[in-house]
């Protein structure tokens, strides 16, 4: 996303929603490129804009990876993130979290585009 100082320790996944181009991006979101505050951003237009983001883990952290559940399975609609983190050192351990798009939509607006009405009204 525009202005993200996080570098390349990120994850990216396209959600398997027929007829929609929804991307979820993960990275650290701190000034100066510090490795803290693992955050996910959502794009609804193929990465042209990233109008919403939500913090997953605020302490020190590092590399992250994303995956999305498969249609027609129990995992459908689930987004999973695996990332490095810790209380004092970013490589203390590996952490995992799962959430859905509705959870991301509860985050903060970035000012980079708008959340489409077809998403906001669901």
Where in this protein do the model-derived segments appear?
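Asp-box/BNR beta-propeller blade signature and adjacent active/binding-site loops
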Residues: 1-122
């Amino acid at each position: 996303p525009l202005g993200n100082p996080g570098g390349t320790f990120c994850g990216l996944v396209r959600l398997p929603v027929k007829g929609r181009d929804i991307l979820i991006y993960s990275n650290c979101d701190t000034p100066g490129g510090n490795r803290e505050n693992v955050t996910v951003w959502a794009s609804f237009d193929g990465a042209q804009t990233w109008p919403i983001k939500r913090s997953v883990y605020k302490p020190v952290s590092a590399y992250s990876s994303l995956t999305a559940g498969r249609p027609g399975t129990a995992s459908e609609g689930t987004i999973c993130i695996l990332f490095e983190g810790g209380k004092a050192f970013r490589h203390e351990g590996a952490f995992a979290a799962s959430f859905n798009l509705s959870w991301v939509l509860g985050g903060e607006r970035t000012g980079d585009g708008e959340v489409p009405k077809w998403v906001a009204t669901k």
